[in-house]
Every structure is written in structure tokens, then in C-alpha cells.
Curated annotation (Swiss-Prot):
The keyword Transferase applies. It is found in: Golgi apparatus membrane. At the beginning of gastrulation, expressed in deep cells of the presumptive mesoderm. At later gastrulation stages, expressed at the interface between already involuted and preinvoluted mesoderm. At late neurula and tailbud stages, expressed in the deep mass of cells lying ventrally and laterally to the closed blastopore. One of its GO terms (biological process) is gastrulation with mouth forming second. Belongs to the camello family. Plays a role in regulation of gastrulation, possibly by controlled reduction of cell adhesion which is necessary for optimal cell motility. Keywords: Acyltransferase, Developmental protein, Gastrulation, Golgi apparatus, Membrane, Transferase, Transmembrane, Transmembrane helix. SUPFAM superfamilies: Acyl-CoA N-acyltransferases (Nat) (SSF55729). This is Probable N-acetyltransferase camello. Its main location: Golgi. CDD domains: NAT_SF.
Amino acid sequence: MANVSIRKYKNSDYETVNFLFVEGTKEHLPAACWNTLKKPRFYFIIIVACASIFMCTSSYVLSLTSLVALLAVGWYGLYLEFHGYASRCQREDMLDIENSYMMSDNTCFWVAEIDRKVVGIVGAKPLKEADDELFLLHLSVARDCRQQRIGTKLCQTVIDFARQRGFKAVCLETANIQDAAIKLYEAVGFKKSLVAIPPFLLNQYTSFTVIYYRYDIKS
């Protein structure tokens, strides 16, 4: 196993950090699509739509075309959700990481390195709703460096930071499609606190849910 070191973010890390963040966000799209394809409701809509078009036109070509169009619309809708999230973060806290995370005693951003190459990232900020709880953000590990406990070390770094700063808990959110992330958080010791349905247009067909986790810090 490679020697992994965790250190605080520097401005010279920006391009690599941004790349890891965007790639980590985009890679959830296939899982979201597959999750949608497993839902009976989705197939019901497809069958009804194609059957209706065939009954009106008696055309197999138009029916198949409508099937492809519906699949394309569904994929594009999911793409817009993930792309929109990444773009929003790049306009907000990820636009200037130094200013967003490194200028306060209670916020921080870390990178994981192997042989001086940045291969993982994570950030932490206090929750706006509860200033005694720290929120873990943007955890991502390069694909070719997984299965080396890098995510675990980054999570533990945030927990240690929270403990040193006197926070009562570390909180985070993930999605039901992120199986590897869920296993990681639960292995570290995070407990599920809430499951919510995000209010985006296609969610009634995708069964996409946001899962909130909490790690209580013992005093």
C-alpha cells in the first residue's frame, strides 16, 4: 500500500483539486441512470408512451424513436442536475478555496498525497443552522487510488479537526446511489440521521434520495 499523507490545501493545488471535484461529481451520473432503469415506474412510463404513439401512428419506427427520445431526455435531465451542482459549487466555495476554507480557524480544506501527487480532497465548514456542528464537504478520491483507505483518512482528519475545535458533531450528506461512499461513512462511524427527497423534476421517476449522516464527537 502506498504511503499517503494528508496536508492542508495550498493555492498551487487548485487545478488538481478542481479536477478531482468535477470528476468525482460526474462519475455519479451512470449510477443515477442505472438506478432509474431499475425502477418499475420508469418502465411503465416508457411502455405507455410507446404504446400510445404506436396506437396513434401504427409506426414501429416512431415508437422506437420515441423510446430513444425519452431515454435521452431522462439522461439529459440527470446530467443537468449533476452538472448544475458542480457548476454552482465552482461559482461559490470552490471558486476561491483559500478564501472559503483557509481564512478561518473553524474551516479547512485538505488534500491527500501519494508521492507528492494530490489524489484526494475534503473540506469542512461549520453548519449555518448549528455552529457547534461541522459539515464535511467535497470528499473525492482519484479513481486509480481507491481501496487504499484514503477516504477513511480524510474523514478522520475532519473528525480530528472538529474535536480539536470543540465541535459536537460532524455532519455530511450523500446520495442513495453512492454505495461506496455510504459504506465508507458507516465504516468510519457515521450514523444515518435523515433521508430526504430532493425537489427536482425527474425525482418522482428516479427515486433519488439524499442521506444525511452524523458523527457525534465524544467529549
